[in-house]
Amino acid sequence: SSAAHHYGSPRVLCESFGGIYWNANFARMKWLTDWEYVLGIDLLNPHGFHYSIEGDRKRDWPPSQFYHHPFWKYYRRFAEYVSRLSYMLSGGKHVANVLFLFPIISAWANYIPQKRTTLFDIIERDFYYLTDMLLRIHWDYDYVDENILRDAEIIGDKIKIKEEFYDVLLLPPITTIKTSTMEKIKNFYNSGGKILAGILLPFQSAEKGYDEEVIKNFRDLFGVDPLEVSSEIIKCISMKRKRYAIKAIKRKNKRGGCAYFIKATAPLSAIKPSKLIDKLLSEMSKADVKIDDPEILCLHKVKDGVDIFFIVNPSEVTRNFTLSLRSRGKPEIWDPENGSVETLWIYQIENNGVKIPLTLHGYGSKFIVLKANEEEPHITDTNIKVERVEKDGDKIRIIAYAERACNAYIEISWKNLKEKLFLGMLEGPKIIELPTKWKFKIIGENAFLIDFWKVKMDDEEERGFKEGWYKPEYDESGWLSLNCGPLSAYFSEAPRALWYKSRFNVEGGKVRKILLDGVEGDAFRLFINGEEINVRGPSSILDVNITEVDISDKVRLGENVIAILIKPSSLKDGLLDPIRILGEFKVTEKECKISLDPLHNEIVVGKSWTEQGFPYYSGTIIYETEIEIPNLTSDKKVLLDCGDVRDILEVVVNDESCGIRLWQPYIIDVTRNLKSGRNKIELKVTNTAANIIKGEKVPSGLLSPPKLIMYDLHEISLGYNDFKGMTNHND
């Protein structure tokens, strides 16, 4: 994105999701997307959409984003989320205070292929540290290479590149610099510019190597000798000191220019002086954004005259924090998940800026948009949750609820007046635990994967037929044991023919078909219980090129035998993928023995599908239950909290859809859908493709018991005349 800013590119594209494998879900894809967009990407190119994943294609930088994945039916919602990000963040002007010199010349100057050098390690590790740390202390920046910096304009005490203006030039530890870069740095300082450097200063030029002029210029600029600080840091590192010393050496000129150098006895990556760097930057420039949580990331853009802040929580836990903005206006929260726009009612106006308390769930993201509207009544402080605020002339009506029992208060500001209202003790929510056993429906068919085989070479090709190797009564226990995969993993040369044989038990249910996938060779034949099966069949729902073969009339109760004869042409051939058996059954493991058993009509919430007979199922299971809710009144707010869901949740109450959650939090407002009396609840849960495609027993389903959380809504109404004046009121 820095290059796009400096070369004038209107869009920044990034190909994403290749290599995140078949257990990828929307939560992980959202995390990656948010990370990219908060760093300046505004056009997503998802990888990839395979027409077919049959055979080795499923291993070519997976996953497919296409119909093979159970989440495909919800993909439009994810695409709409990304579209909203792109719409909000495309175009406009990026706001950053810091210009960060990219230290590639110094890295090459100190790089030795045969070994790592001390100076190269400092340059590399401190570059990575500064890159991450600046994001965490919320000083946004652009990288700049020396050619771009050479051509940049100096306007007053700022550096201008295309449409970007920068207050501070940051020099990471460097040893080597172009002469033109050195001249630009001097001119910037002499024009009142601010420069922050650390640990190392240049003593070489790219043109000459060791360069006395470079040493003199940087010694005059920062008041320290570049050769001395280089020798000292190398000596300190070699002594392996456990205690570090660090200080800032500050130089200023009459035009307001600042040249600050951080001198230390260890690299920045070892000391991690984020507070010191934040303090020094704050002396040089006014922070555009301050957030009291280093885990929260922020991108600021100005578009159509409006300040837009993209706020991201890349951690998995809910975070409460305060967002302090130098800009001023009426804040709105724009939700890219559903496209809603709501006024933010809780904030403070301080020092001509805005302070906003916010909460973001794990992997959450929101836009804060500042609108230049007239002063509105707003809440400056409260310990209860504000549901909504309605304004009618000189009157406001606040609807709120207590998330826990408390002595409630709410402080309201309107123009130059403020009023703090004490509401007394409010009760917390009522929790309604839902049943642990639910009825269920499985969409499609359950799966059982056979990945363990007994294998024997048949160099005569016909010997296996003559001796009946494919028959149930033939004992294959002495054969070679192996898993699916190319023959190169087990053989030095391809045999003329190879028999695969495996056994499985059926105790009930209905076995309907098998899927033939990754059976590679010049020819192959399939046998079930000694009877050859016609391998021609229709395309399966899993993939257009994976054949579906009906075996419903070949399978019997008790032990069943499957045998496959493959004639490979090379070591790349063989049985590359598990054989997938589909039908209406559950997979049961008892005393290390696996059987296919009859389905029951109940499923337990709080336990994975993999523990309840569906270890290889990928798709959707519908949980169904009914609950009684007496005397449900209009002054209630009811949330359905499903806790830990893997991976997509769709909620239907009384036959009406209430919402879909592609990622956490799996909480949905069901207030309008519930009624007094009997209520029917359906939870449609969809997992990933890893279970059926890779045979991975990825936890799926409702992994914690759902519950209803019922809050009492309270109404606070007051007019402008109810306020009391306060002198010198900042807010």
What are these model-derived regions, one by one?
Residues 349-353, 542-548, 661-668:
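Short, solvent-exposed loop/turn segments in extracellular or other extracytoplasmic domains
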Residues 548-554, 668-671, 694:
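Signal that preferentially marks extracellular ectodomain short beta-strand elements
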Residues 1-473, 477-481, 487-513, 531-541, ...:
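Carbohydrate-binding surfaces of carbohydrate-active enzymes
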Residues 479, 496, 504-530, 562-564, ...:
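Aromatic-lined ligand-binding clefts that engage carbohydrates, nucleic acids, or primary amines
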Residues 558, 670-677:
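Glycine-centered tight-turn motifs at strand-turn-strand junctions
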Residues 533-539, 656-663:
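Long, low-complexity serine/threonine/glycine- and acidic-rich segments characteristic of extracellular
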